[in-house]
């Protein structure tokens, strides 16, 4: 990848000495969807696919950025003394937001740089290409200027940038999984306390297969922020009878006993999903430790149905992919992953059935929707970092 990045960099900015190389992964969430901003648990892992960068220092205050994934957009430029969100900068607002966040927290960025990005995360697939770019930019600034900033602070800064600079009310899961990822491990993360534990995925004989619906979706334009508000409204109702700070504080049995406090029926269903999905995420992490694969498959099924019926963030394309997967003999479990409204599914498939799964599920999906799905056999990798000798 280094040689490829060098070539792109030279063609865009000319050849420069002292190039440094960085990588930030994408992420996939095995279970625990739309729980992160509800103070619940998630169970994500970092992928080996992600975003790469080649960086050269400048001796002025100019930052020049180019993405090989958005070639037609050309070079995006900004000055370090005037970092602002500009709609026409599109993808470049994500790294700009992280630069701005460093500056706002008193971490000086003394000079600019030229940077080339190149990613192999499908854009809009729900595998967190945006958070990948944010953490990548964070690691660049950390490595060049502020080694005292630890990984957890980088994660928080990237999330804050997306919330306040980009204007997407995301939880912390994406940035956390990408910043703190560990090879061959998922992490059970409490999104309220940020307590976490790594869980080695004993998936011998099994493969994680990501399927991209290729249904166009953009998170900021979807109903994401609406769902967040509905959950907040439900929480306010529940607080009238329960001493809780977040939906993630409630056990399913307590929710069932007090759900009538929630006046609005739609909000009640949203909250039910958040409470039960939090329980499913915790249980799934335990099931991986016990190697209880069949129970994991059942929990994934329950998760998808809850996202479909109670949270209403699936779509016909996601449902078709998941239903086709459930009908395949080699599948342990399958569900939508990510924010929904399009994007990807994650399936646990027996190794010997992977090729047949991709063929048959892909054919059935195309027949039902007219769209061709893309499939990726996922490898679980390390978090965002500078590539030194890799």
Swiss-Prot record:
UniProt binding sites for substrate: 33-36, 224
MF (Gene Ontology): ATP binding; galactokinase activity; magnesium ion binding
Positions with a binding annotation for Mg(2+): 130, 162
Residues that coordinate or bind ATP: 67, 124-130
GO terms classed as biological process: galactose metabolic process
Membrane-spanning ranges: none
Cellular component annotations (GO), alphabetically ordered: cytosol
Cellular location(s): Cytoplasm
Sorted UniProt keywords: ATP-binding, Carbohydrate metabolism, Cytoplasm, Galactose metabolism, Kinase, Magnesium, Metal-binding, Nucleotide-binding, Transferase
Broad EC category: transferase
Site feature (Transition state stabilizer) residues: 27
Enzyme Commission identifier(s): 2.7.1.6
One Pfam entry name: GHMP_kinases_N
Positions annotated as active site in the UniProt record: 174
Pathway: Carbohydrate metabolism; galactose metabolism
Catalytically driven reaction(s): alpha-D-galactose + ATP = alpha-D-galactose 1-phosphate + ADP + H(+)
PROSITE patterns: GALACTOKINASE (PS00106), GHMP_KINASES_ATP (PS00627)
Family, as annotated: Belongs to the GHMP kinase family. GalK subfamily.
Entry function: Catalyzes the transfer of the gamma-phosphate of ATP to D-galactose to form alpha-D-galactose-1-phosphate (Gal-1-P).
PANTHER family given in the database record: GALACTOKINASE-RELATED, MEVALONATE KINASE/GALACTOKINASE
Protein name: Galactokinase
């Amino acid at each position: 990848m280094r040689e490829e990045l060098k070539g792109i960099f030279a063609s865009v900015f000319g050849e420069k000495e002292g190039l440094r190389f960085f990588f930030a992964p994408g992420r996939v969430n095995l279970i625990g969807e739309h729980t992160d901003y509800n103070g619940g648990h998630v169970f994500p892992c970092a992928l080996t696919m992600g975003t790469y960068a080649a960086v050269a220092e400048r001796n002025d205050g100019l930052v020049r950025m180019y993405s090989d994934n958005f070639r037609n957009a050309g070079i995006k430029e900004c000055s370090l003394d005037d970092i602002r969100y500009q709609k026409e900068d599109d993808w470049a607002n994500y790294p700009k937001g992280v630069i701005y966040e460093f500056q706002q927290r008193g971490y000086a960025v003394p000079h600019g740089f030229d940077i080339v990005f190149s990613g192999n995360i499908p854009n809009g697939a729900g595998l967190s290409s945006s958070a990948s770019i944010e953490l990548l930019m964070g690691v660049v600034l950390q490595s060049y200027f502020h080694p005292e900033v630890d990984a957890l602070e980088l994660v928080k800064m990237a999330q804050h940038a997306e919330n306040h600079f980009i204007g997407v009310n995301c939880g912390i899961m994406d940035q956390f999984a990408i910043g703190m990822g560990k090879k061959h491990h998922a992490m059970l993360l409490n999104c309220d306390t940020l307590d976490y534990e790594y869980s080695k995925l004993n998936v011998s004989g099994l493969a994680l297969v990501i399927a991209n619906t290729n249904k166009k979706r953009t998170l900021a334009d979807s109903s994401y922020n609406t769902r967040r508000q509905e959950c907040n409204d439900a929480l306010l109702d529940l607080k009238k009878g329960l001493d809780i700070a977040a939906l993630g504080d409630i056990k399913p049995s307590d929710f069932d006993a007090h759900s009538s406090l929630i006046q609005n029926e739609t909000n009640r269903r949203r909250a039910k999903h958040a409470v039960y999905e939090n329980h499913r995420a915790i249980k799934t992490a335990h099931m991986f430790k016990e190697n209880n694969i069949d129970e994991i498959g059942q929990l994934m099924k329950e998760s998808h149905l809850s996202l479909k019926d109670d949270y209403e963030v699936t779509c016909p394309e996601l449902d078709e992919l998941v239903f086709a997967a459930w009908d395949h003999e080699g599948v342990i479990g399958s569900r939508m992953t990510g924010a929904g409204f399009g994007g990807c599914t994650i399936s646990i498939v027996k190794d010997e059935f992977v090729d047949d799964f991709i063929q048959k599920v892909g054919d059935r999906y195309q027949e039902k929707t007219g769209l061709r799905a893309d499939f990726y056999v996922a490898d679980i990798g390390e978090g965002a970092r500078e590539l030194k000798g890799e």
